[in-house]
Amino acid sequence: MNDQRKGDHAEPTTHFGYQDVPESQKAKKVAEVFHSVAAKYDLMNDVLSGGMHRLWKRFTIELSGVRAGNRVLDIAGGTGDLAAKFSRLVGPTGQVVLADINESMLKVGRDRLLDRGVAGNIEFVQADAEKLPFPDNHFDCVTIAFGLRNVTHKDEAIRSMLRVLKPGGRLLVLEFSKPTNKLMSKAYDAYSFAFMPLAGKLITNDSESYRYLAESIRMHPDQETLKAMMVEAGFDRVTYHNMTSGIVAVHRGIKP
């Protein structure tokens, strides 16, 4: 975040992709992006990742340790990929809360899971990750997949996730990160800034949202920085696993 001020009463700014915008405007701009892409979000995930997002999410679920009877919160749950799998794991004695700040994404997720008949133990909640509307010490596991980079105050969101976890509960953060290989990094940059906006234009008639996606990935904290943020928030035993040469990383932390 850029806290420089143009005057004594100027609003702090933050990044929206590569742009500096007033903090109060970022959530609105992010909402516009996801209202635009919600209907074809799943298709674009498959196109842009070559289906790899399914493997990344599967590994995240394996790391979560979720079992029957658990209570799970999936933040920025969108179209419900993780929630559907957690629903089967926790069974009829457990509960999954699919939370998303974006009404369009939440509607797509709700409709999709209801159509698949897997929403019996899933609750759908419109919620801000920075101000989660849940009791303290409530969940066995909290996940956020490809959502943290869109949050204005990431530190506040991580503290909010810690608060709602039970002692011993796990936080899993699956997010785009920094490639560990220089050659891969160069190829990924070319892919991100050429192919992603083009695919967005062809499939959703919206290149700008996918340009924002590419830029937001570059502005997100790298693996070690995010690990330090989780430790600072109060998590123990924070580790991360790189996937696809660090293009994606999953961080895990335990609430003391």
Curated annotation (Swiss-Prot):
PROSITE patterns: SAM_MT_UBIE, UBIE_1, UBIE_2. CDD domains: AdoMet_MTases (cd02440). Keywords: Menaquinone biosynthesis, Methyltransferase, S-adenosyl-L-methionine, Transferase, Ubiquinone biosynthesis. Residues 1-22 are annotated as: Disordered. It catalyses: a 2-demethylmenaquinol + S-adenosyl-L-methionine = a menaquinol + S-adenosyl-L-homocysteine + H(+); a 2-methoxy-6-(all-trans-polyprenyl)benzene-1,4-diol + S-adenosyl-L-methionine = a 5-methoxy-2-methyl-3-(all-trans-polyprenyl)benzene-1,4-diol + S-adenosyl-L-homocysteine + H(+). It comes from Pseudomonas putida. S-adenosyl-L-methionine binds at T79, D100, D128, A129. It comes from the Bacteria. Methyltransferase required for the conversion of demethylmenaquinol (DMKH2) to menaquinol (MKH2) and the conversion of 2-polyprenyl-6-methoxy-1,4-benzoquinol (DDMQH2) to 2-polyprenyl-3-methyl-6-methoxy-1,4-benzoquinol (DMQH2). Pfam families: Ubie_methyltran. GO terms for biological process: aerobic respiration; menaquinone biosynthetic process; methylation. The gene is ubiE. Belongs to the class I-like SAM-binding methyltransferase superfamily. MenG/UbiE family. Its EC number is 2.1.1.163, 2.1.1.201. This is Ubiquinone/menaquinone biosynthesis C-methyltransferase UbiE. It is an enzyme of class 2 (transferase). The keyword Methyltransferase applies. Residues 1-12 have a biased composition (Basic and acidic residues). One of its GO terms (molecular function) is demethylmenaquinone methyltransferase activity. Pathway: Quinol/quinone metabolism; menaquinone biosynthesis; menaquinol from 1,4-dihydroxy-2-naphthoate: step 2/2; Cofactor biosynthesis; ubiquinone biosynthesis.
